[in-house]
Amino acid sequence: MEYQLTLNWPDFLERHWQKRPVVLKRGFSNFIDPLSPDELAGLAMESEIDSRLVSHQDGKWQVSHGPFESYDHLGESNWSLLVQAVNHWHEPTAALMRPFRALPDWRIDDLMISFSVPGGGVGPHLDQYDVFIIQGTGRRRWRVGEKLQMRQHCPHPDLLQVDPFEAIIDEELEPGDILYIPPGFPHEGYALENAMNYSVGFRAPNSRELISGFADYVLQRELGNTYYSDPDMPSRKHPADILPQERDKLRNMMLDLINEPAHFQQWLGEFLSQSRHELDIAPPEPPYQPDEIYDALKQGEVLVRLGGLRVLRIGDEVYANGEKIDSPHRPALEALASHIALTAENFGDALEDPSFLAMLAALVNSGYWFFEG
């Protein structure tokens, strides 16, 4: 299924992106859910998939984590089932992500899907990421407050909420409506009837994650073996002092590593192309031979990217799931990064190069791409 999003992206980016929340009425016209509540419940029974149940009964919040064996104990009100990264595991839902590729691939995170019975929700809370919440089957009331300093508390160890807030948006969403919420705006949503919601999340790394990730890269590759030296050490009155020039030299030793262009780019491509959630990787059995890849493409078969696989480009270099893809065929690499579905035409003359075919076969045999159908 192909979803058509009615949205003026330049206007949205100027007026709303990371600035103000907005309701996009009928953002998807004639919206059809890509999966059923029963299918979502089935996914939450799988151990590889991150899921949780949140309920609010008799004034108490409860959270339980999947995999779940049964839902028979749940009542008919005040609970929600939430499943992360469904686009990694259920191919039809991945189509719901594609209209949002007007935004950078490296910023997109995953598709979280929730099923809620009347009164179901997770309470008032803050997120530190951008999210587009698409209303599927059913109706849900959403309230969004102003971005202010708010006290957060935990009514349950696995649930962080904020105090009640005054709403700047108070809307009932119907199928195809979209609510965009930037980071830091408090919000809460409660189902008015059995309802499906699809949350397209966009995350940004914080400074701690960047420093930690780069430090891991340095350690793995045994970089930074230059030792501090001070042949021009000045005398000092107090032996406990670290002099300003010594402090600056130590800091510059660290910055020199980060500022080395080749290392930084290699790390950044690997770091940003890694998925935060597990992928549904299923290498083909038996593995493809390069000539089989060639024949299949030439016969018109379509090569499809695995749901949730991050394929990013920095300059001329392409990275997939934390690995650099090496090939001199730049247009073919660009096609791998730009297109979800690929045909022989996308690869051009690269298919005539045995080394490129071998590389492509390795990617397919890793489970990163597969032939449609």
Spans of model-derived segments:
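C-terminal amphipathic alpha-helical segment
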Residues: Q220-E292
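Acidic, low-complexity/disordered tracts enriched in E/D and polar residues
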Residues: N259-A337, A361, G373
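Long, charge-rich, low-complexity alpha-helical segments
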Residues: F12, K19, K324-G373
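Short coil/turn segments at secondary-structure boundaries
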Residues: S55-H56, Q265-G269, G348
